Amino acid sequence: MASYDYDLITIGAGSGGVRASRIAAGHGAKVAVIEEDRPGGTCVLRGCVPKKLLMFGSLFSAEVEDAIGFGWGDDHADSDDGIAWSHDWGGLITRKNAELDRLSGIYQNLLDNAGVELIAGRGVITGPHSVRVGEREYTAERILIAVGGWPHFPPVEGVADHGISSNEALELSYRPDEIVIFGAGYIAVEFAGIFNGFGSKTHLVYRADLPLRGFDEDLRKGLAEAMEARGIILHPGCTITGAVSYTHLRAHETKPNL
């Protein structure tokens, strides 16, 4: 019978990989998890959690505007709207990162408490029972691939050089004055709401006639109207044909205006 370093090696310490590894260890297996970043995965580090934190923060600008109609204001404000307010983007990102550190630490503790070894580095499968991390090779009876997904750039000239993905959008050190978002799926729509809420001039460019393709038609129409009412500039029936800088994009119509 073959001898291995571990019963199970999991590549990826996201929600799925951590859970599977803990369950296996709980049944007596010797388990290692290989992770090139830190425990948490897409949801905790680059997806649901940081995005929802920014989304929640962006909603307060609308609350301030609504408050004016209910008599709230500052007699000493310089703003014509009656309320003087500002936003510390750097402070928001710092606090967001602190929360991600806390949650990643919880994932690390879950692995430690289950007796799962965490191996830092990028795992490369070298055989049916072997994975290389750096210069060292590890063996296991079973290898579980739980690496999740990763955003990609469309094959459009200049986009990869001058654009950013959702990963980088969550790590910006400053709030852009203006931003163009290509696509109108739920992730793009969420980011449009985030940057618009924080005061960025926001463009949403998409090929379809309405955002959120595949969703209920009435919902899509209502969403488009609500986004425009909030000041988001919609570009339906368009695609990006090239990018020359972060602030200069070329677009053209993909169908005639009727």
Language-model regions, residue ranges each:
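N-terminal Rossmann-like FAD-binding beta1-loop-alpha1 element of flavoenzymes
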Residues: L8-A32, A192-N196
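Glycine-rich flavin
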Residues: S3-Y6, R22-A29, I34-R175, A208-L212, ...
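Conserved small/polar residues in nucleotide/adenosyl-binding loops
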Residues: T247-P256
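Conserved phosphate-binding and hydrolysis motifs of nucleotide-dependent enzymes
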Residues: G12-G17, G148, G183-A188, E253
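Beta1/beta-strand and adjacent pyrophosphate-binding region of the FAD-binding site
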Residues: Y4-A13, D177-F182
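Rossmann-like NAD(P)H-binding beta-loop-alpha module
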Residues: Y174-R207, G214
